[in-house]
């Protein structure tokens, strides 16, 4: 960039913010600079107070049995580990000096939302915002680095909102016709579909519990739910309808499209699976734009929500971890660390595009946010059950047209200590080495053995790992209810439990392209189904205080 092209004031010394360079999407066409009086909103993630102490606290608590853990309170978190008020004051000065306004400050999450005209944003962050056209839709982005005044660079960990491309896709799959088209299923269609109640029975969810006293947060980046459809569905199952509330994030709201094949399918699948199995819990649905800023703000809003106070967060959206800017992944992971400290269990779908996660670069990829070590990654199986008993369960893999469970080895997150004895293989990518293994657990996800749900008033069958995240969310809600407190960060605990609390999946692979079949199911943990599908009552018993006291 020449001196003539610099968008910032010449007298300011600038520093590059690491991890913000973005590669443009394949087939994207640069259509020139963003102009006009459009107002741009940007989320700035500030450094936290005593971040090392927070990580140490989470590690200490994770080593304890769930009933013995001491979680931080939301009310005190902002003062102890949020961004400092002095840093917010500096960001306000920075904003005002560059023609921006500070619209919102979230102390606990450590985020500041700034807005202003295009020219002001360009000058403040040392970028030139540009329009890009793409077959999947146009978006705004920038080329090169993000640069801020050297005086405030140490305060800033990430900047979200300069790039508006969708960062995630919903991980659900509709059942297909034989010729490969998708179809809505009538009540009289093939019997290889289950209600959530059927699946819970097969997985031996503990009975006599309904999630009372819990709040399950569901993150949605599009679509909406129809209250009539939800009422129809829960009535058909003979269960009480849960309380469902919507929360608007960054202007997004509950906006059902009326198209059961669109994002409404994701939203209502999530609510219906979680609500059917934990009808006593409150379901809080956080709607946000499908951008990096929207996704982050939805998660931080849910995790730090002082009104609904979720104890569980279910995420059915994600994308290949290498499609995220490094700074964005780090900031999202920080939000998941917050959740762990607050005793919030976060679950995410592992993806529906096999070991490549839908990428076409010849490499193996895992999905984010499932790859975060603070997230319980949920893979997918093909379940055959009868009369409440599992007859056969294998890795879900229907090939490139039908989808397959995500899973593999992260290229970004190192191998966590709690996975060191799980025999996580090295990454299949050349020279990549070890890393966080994905998924942690699994459940029914094959559309051929999918979930019968009602989407926009239409009965259909849906699969995908999207169904597994709310399935486990409901199980955690029941466990929390029984324990009388949230289990919180579950990952380290699950890897210490006896293998008998899971149904081990030992057949299949997630090589969607049928190449080397590098990631295979096998005894114990594997990169297709993790530790296996749950045996719910055994999992609960293993987490009860009496069980932990009996262990050596």
UniProtKB/Swiss-Prot annotation:
GO annotation, biological process: proteolysis
EC number per UniProt: 3.4.21.123
Temperature dependence (free text): Optimum temperature is 70 degrees Celsius. Retains 60% of the original activity at 80 degrees Celsius for 10 minutes, but loses its proteolytic activity after 10 minutes at 90 degrees Celsius.
Peptidase S53 domain residues: 193-546
UniProt keyword Protease present: yes
Positions annotated as active site in the UniProt record: 266 (charge relay system), 270 (charge relay system), 466 (charge relay system)
CC cofactor: Ca(2+)
Post-translational modification as stated in the protein's UniProt record: Autocatalytically processed.
Chain positions covered by the region annotation Disordered: 1-34
Reactions that this protein is recorded to catalyse: The enzyme preferentially hydrolyzes peptides having an Ala or Pro residue at P2 position and prefers such charged amino acid residues as Glu or Arg at the P2' position. In the oxidized insulin B chain, kumamolysin preferentially cleaves between Leu(15) and Tyr(16)
Binding positions (Ca(2+)): 504-505, 522, 524, 526
GO MF term set: metal ion binding; serine-type endopeptidase activity; tripeptidyl-peptidase activity
Subcellular location: Secreted
Keyword terms of this UniProt record: Calcium, Hydrolase, Metal-binding, Protease, Secreted, Serine protease, Signal, Zymogen
Recorded GO CC terms: extracellular region
Biological role stated in the UniProt entry: Thermostable pepstatin-insensitive serine-carboxyl proteinase. Preferentially hydrolyzes synthetic peptides having an Ala or Pro residue at the P2 position and charged amino acids such as Glu or Arg at the P2' position. In vitro, specifically hydrolyzes the Leu-15-Tyr-16 peptide bond in oxidized insulin B-chain. Additional cleavage of oxidized insulin B-chain at Phe-25-Tyr-26 is detected at a considerably lower rate. Can hydrolyze collagen and the chromogenic substrate azocoll. Shows lower activity with albumin and casein. Shows very weak tripeptidyl peptidase activity.
Domain writeup: The core of its prodomain resembles the prodomains of the pro-subtilisins and of the pro-protein convertases. The prodomain may stabilize (by interacting with helices h4 and h5) a folding intermediate of the catalytic domain. The catalytic domain has adopted a mature-like conformation already in the proform.
This protein's name: Kumamolisin
Gene: kscP
């Amino acid at each position: 960039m020449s001196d003539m092209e610099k968008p910032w004031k010449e007298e300011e010394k600038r520093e590059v913010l690491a991890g913000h360079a973005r590669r443009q999407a394949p087939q994207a066409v640069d259509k020139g600079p963003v102009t006009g009086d459009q107002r741009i909103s940007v989320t700035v993630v500030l450094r936290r107070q005593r971040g090392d102490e927070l990580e140490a606290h989470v590690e200490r608590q994770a080593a304890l049995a769930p009933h013995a853990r001491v979680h931080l309170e939301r009310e005190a978190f902002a003062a102890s580990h949020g961004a400092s008020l002095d840093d917010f004051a500096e960001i306000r000065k920075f904003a005002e000096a560059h023609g921006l306004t500070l619209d919102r400050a979230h102390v606990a999450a450590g985020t500041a939302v700034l807005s202003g005209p295009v020219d002001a944003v360009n000058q403040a962050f040392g970028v030139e915002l540009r329009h890009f056209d793409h077959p999947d839709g146009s978006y705004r982005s920038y080329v090169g680095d993000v640069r801020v005044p050297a005086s405030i660079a140490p305060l800033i960990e990430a900047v979200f909102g300069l790039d508006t491309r969708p960062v995630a896709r919903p991980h659900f799959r509709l059942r297909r016709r034989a010729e490969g088209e998708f179809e809505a299923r009538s009540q009289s269609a093939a019997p290889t579909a289950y209600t959530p109640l059927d699946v819970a029975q097969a997985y031996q969810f503990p009975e006599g519990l309904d999630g009372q006293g819990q709040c399950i947060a569901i993150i949605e980046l599009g679509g909406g739910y129809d209250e009539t459809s939800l009422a129809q569905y829960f009535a058909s199952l003979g269960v009480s309808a849960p309380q469902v509330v919507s929360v608007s994030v960054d202007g997004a709201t509950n906006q059902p499209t009326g198209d059961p094949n669109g994002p409404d399918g994701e939203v209502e699948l999530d609510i219906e699976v979680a609500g059917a199995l934990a009808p006593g819990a409150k379901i809080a649905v956080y709607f946000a734009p499908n951008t990096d800023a929207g996704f982050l703000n939805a998660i931080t809003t849910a995790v730090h929500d002082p009104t609904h106070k979720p104890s569980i967060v279910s995420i059915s959206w994600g994308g290949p971890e290498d499609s995220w800017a490094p700074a964005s992944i780090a900031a999202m992971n920080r939000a998941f660390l917050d959740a762990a400290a607050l005793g919030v269990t976060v679950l995410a779908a592992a993806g529906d595009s096999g070991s490549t996660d839908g990428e076409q670069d010849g490499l193996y990829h895992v999905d984010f946010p499932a790859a975060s070590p603070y997230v319980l990654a949920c893979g997918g199986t093909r379940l055959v059950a009868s009369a409440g008993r599992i007859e056969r369960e294998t890795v879900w893999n229907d090939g490139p047209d039908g989808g397959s469970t995500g899973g593999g080895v992260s290229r970004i997150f190192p191998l966590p200590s709690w996975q060191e004895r799980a025999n996580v293989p090295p990454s299949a990518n050349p020279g990549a080495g070890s890393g966080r293994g994905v998924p942690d657990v699994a459940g029914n996800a094959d559309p051929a053995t999918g979930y019968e749900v009602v989407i926009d008033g239409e009965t259909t069958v849906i699969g995908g790992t999207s169904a597994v995240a709310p399935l486990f969310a409901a199980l955690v809600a029941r466990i929390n209810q029984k324990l009388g407190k949230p289990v919180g960060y579950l990952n380290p605990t699950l890897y210490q439990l006896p293998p008998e609390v899971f149904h081990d999946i030992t057949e299949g692979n997630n090589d969607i392209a049928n190449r080397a079949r590098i990631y295979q199911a096998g005894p114990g943990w594997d990169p297709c189904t993790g530790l296996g599908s749950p045996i719910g009552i055994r999992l609960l018993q293993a987490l009860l205080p009496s069980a932990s006291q009996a262990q050596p």
